[in-house]
Amino acid sequence: MASPGFAHDTAGMSTTRIGPRVTVGHGAILHGCIVEGDSIIGMGSILLDNCVIGEHCIIGAGALVPMGRVIPPRSMVLGSPGKVVRSISDTELEWIKYSWTIYKETSMSYGRSDG
């Protein structure tokens, strides 16, 4: 997960679970939601309690996904409240995978020194 986002849940009401290879943009808030793998959560987006983001999704910057909303796999979500605007293309799916790899490689380089 890329940072600095914020993940939190409401005890007894919701649980936050983030799947593998998810990229979370700066300032995003994940509050008691489930995000399946290989997805991108855009900068400043807000995911509220008990919403479920399917795998291979892109949640656009600033989107608000309301409580309990279920987003199908391979969906592009934009707006407030967030709405599915279209399906993710094969090219975008490759971009999702590439984005995660770049964040991972960048995070691994922190703390390294060439001497």
Go through the PLM ranges and name each one:
Residues 1-78, 82-84:
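Structural signal for interior beta-strand "rungs" in well-ordered beta-sheet cores
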Residues 69-75, 80-115:
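Terminal amphipathic alpha-helical/low-complexity segments used for targeting or macromolecular assembly
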